[in-house]
Amino acid sequence: MIARRMLCARPWGPSCVVCALCGALAALVPAVGAQEQAVPAPGTPAPPAHTASEAVPPAPEPRAEGEQPSPLVPTALPVPGGAVAARAAPGTVGPRLWEQLLQWRVQHGDEHQAPQMAYEIAANNYDIALVKSIVDLRMGTGHIHHNLNGNGAGGMANGTPTLSPYVHLFFPTYQNLSLKADIAIKTNTPSADVTALFGMDLYSKVRRQHQLQVRRARNSMLDAFAAHLRGQHAAREAFLAELDELLSAYSTLLEAQVTEQECTRLVRTMRIQRYQAHSVKLRSATLKHARAERVARRARKTFTALYQDFVRKCGAFEGNDPETFMLHLAQVVPQEPVSSTALLSVENDWEFLKNREDLETQAEARAVDAISYGFNVESGVGSEGKSLKRILANVRMDFPGGGFWLGLNLPYPQWSRVEVKFRLTWDPLSIKYQELSRQTLQLHERLSALKLQDAYEASERKVLGLRHTAESLGWEQEAALTELNILRRSAQTHQKWLERGAIGAHQHARAQHAYLQALITLAKINIKILKFNLETASSFRPVL
């Protein structure tokens, strides 16, 4: 507690940032007595001579008699593995702190569970569409007739039941090839009537319709898979966002503590200087101090709430001292380089590729719907028992606004008793509908071209923006690292000056505060780079 007494005369408080920091860093501070002194009195020996690498210490700020040092920040710098690790719970603060927190967050987060299930659903739908496009099998009992009166009405002698089962087999992607077998069975006879038909489309939209359904299902599956991959990054992105917010709250808390102590020092100095209670300056300073206290309390509440939520989600030990935990966590944020953007292009942008595929799929759907012609042929035979009785042939043709169907039934061997069936349908207004449909299709094509151009330009702007962001982040990281090194050396120099009694604790604390803020700034920039690298990896297709 020597370091604590050296900086602050207030009693120990668990809610005080300075108390926690001083306690965590006490092991790094030598047991020095009252090292904070004003300018040496006449006759006292001068401070030790400075080396060439040390700057000449500034004159200490004047302080009124009886004023206590300002408890802003600790007198010693936190270093990984030192007092910070010693005061933490085992296994929660150490060199592998970052990996432990991130691994827990990813394994126990639910950000990737919903995309995983959505991908499995889309994969099942794709399998269904694929099977339906290859083969379609339909089987049934057909109509079952039974005369309960037993009078033989309707051809059912003595109430004998009749069955008409059927088997229909279709191959949609193979010119809608079809095989049909219909059987009429009477239970009182050993034979059955069988009708077998073979048919195919010479021209129709059935094949393209099924191919379109498969394409849509495949696109949905690929989109779900991409979302699943992004879901694996979602836990990392959520972890980084929460940590960035927590570091911002901690920085705000430190700043509020500094402002509060500055206001406290100002009010104390003015009272020592005999300012009257009704003095405008003293009243203004007192009001400013009260506001600073409120801001500090709000900052403390915000930081505490975010800290508790963060450690709960990451499986950290809540008994850790928050300030010690935050100082060490700010130091272990990985310092990665910014991902290269040289290979980023529009053709690798997943979002642009998805937009282009969606527009092409929509255009294909409109083209399929616009098909109004179709030509189907079907032929087969009919038998009674083992005897061939007839030959069947059907022709169906569809055209804009109507269609016709022609059926031939050739009895065998009585060829002269040919049975012909014919059906014609026509809608006179369909000609007008077809003209409007063609105009609509052309407008859709032009609109799709505009949308594709907009998507291309948006992707180009995205690539350029990412390149500028990468350049800016690299510069910010370099500048923050340079500033941190400068402020670290400055804080170490102020530490030596404080030990020699050349400066006061207030000047020393301000140097320490500047170093801590620079440390947090660098950590936040490193987090931004990590988020940028994740976004780039998940937004663009890898170039092989």
From Swiss-Prot:
Region spans: Disordered: 38-69
Keyword Signal attributed: yes
Domain of life from the UniProt record: Bacteria
Signal peptide: 1-34
Keyword Signal among UniProt keywords: yes
Key words, A-Z: Signal
Family: Belongs to the TP096X family.
Protein name stated in the entry: Uncharacterized protein TP_0966
Classification of source organism: Bacteria, Pseudomonadati, Spirochaetota, Spirochaetia, Spirochaetales
